[in-house]
């Protein structure tokens, strides 16, 4: 009797469940309730076959307030710093194409004479970039998009989804002028490959210029101004790369007329052996200029190389022409020249260039570079006095073609043999002439005239001796 009465009465739990899950309540709008298949036993708990506990998926989103319909504008206050997030898709849809063909300039692949197959796993680093012209930004991008795409630049090697999904994830609609590309850099740092993922799968080549320490000595490219690179557009990773050599004899496409890349390790040029004996900087005893060793980090190796060179030859860094004081023995070549046909009267003869005569240690043939040689006397004296346009057909003065006295240059002082002894003798003559005028009690003007006449006589005597030593006559 009591059990029947208690079973007919509704408890607080039943009233709460009817209030929440009733057909007239809004919370049950998105729930798919299924009726019970049969009467449950008294000892078993009733099971609610709804969207939370059932195996079937709900037909509509559970939280409509956080899932607006497509096309509806979402308030900025709701999203905050996340303007847009990519939709989650299964990895089965991301199917990369079977292969890409990459055209590489023949200058970038020395030794490659035909198509070669390079798998992606063979040390290739893929960097997603998008090349735009300088001064233009990414179309349709915003500061929030740029901040969202910034972390992508730190990825050096990653896996990409399909091109359609990557375009949606980038948040930047593609325009017809954009040229998204993937730059593949080998681990050795030797080449970079450029892949264009246009609609027609057209492949384009790209000129690359290595960066050296001294950019002024490197020939500049004839291409237009460099272009800026923006990271953001993700492209599918090809399974294999077919390296096809392309002869660089045609015009490059307008989309890739540039060679600017993101800042990274510079492409090092060919190594230069700077501690060898045939290095000009090392032979002259100076540090290398515009070389890879232009610093003090290799000082220990440089000191060892210098010591080894000096052990073999103590005079290795000494000049070929010895140094002497004024009035000492004449200079001579330490090894001697080895001229064959010039007669030692050309500038490439080291003895003639140093204005010294050949000695017994020279191995020259038909030498004319000696003291009493008339050709040497004429060549040593006349080039300092000749005008640059006297002989149009010859760049040097030949003794057979020379005729007449040389003309003095207008912008150059004449060479003279005036020494300190000549100056002292001239001053002594002038003082003697002044004392003589003072003893005779001449007027000041007459005394000045006598001193000037004595100076003219001394000067004419000096010039007479100078011309006589050169074989010239004064009319």
UniProtKB/Swiss-Prot annotation:
The reply on keyword Nucleus is yes
User: Which residues are recorded as modified (Phosphoserine)?
Assistant: 34, 67
Q: Secreted: is it a keyword of this entry?
A: no
Task: Specify the CRC domain's residue ranges.
Answer: 263-372
- Which organism is this protein's natural source? Rattus norvegicus (Rat)
Q: Where is this protein primarily located?
A: cytoplasm
Q: What job does the chain carry out? A: May have a role in spermatogenesis.
- Can you name this protein? Tesmin
Compartment(s) where it occurs, according to its Swiss-Prot or TrEMBL record: Cytoplasm; Nucleus
| Entry keywords, A to Z | Cytoplasm, Developmental protein, Differentiation, Nucleus, Phosphoprotein, Spermatogenesis
Q: Which family does it belong to?
A: Belongs to the lin-54 family.
Q: Which InterPro entries match?
A: CRC, Lin-54_fam, Tesmin/TSO1-like_CXC
What's a single GO CC term here?
A: cytoplasm
Q: Which GO terms describe its biological process?
A: cell differentiation; male meiotic nuclear division; regulation of DNA-templated transcription; spermatogenesis
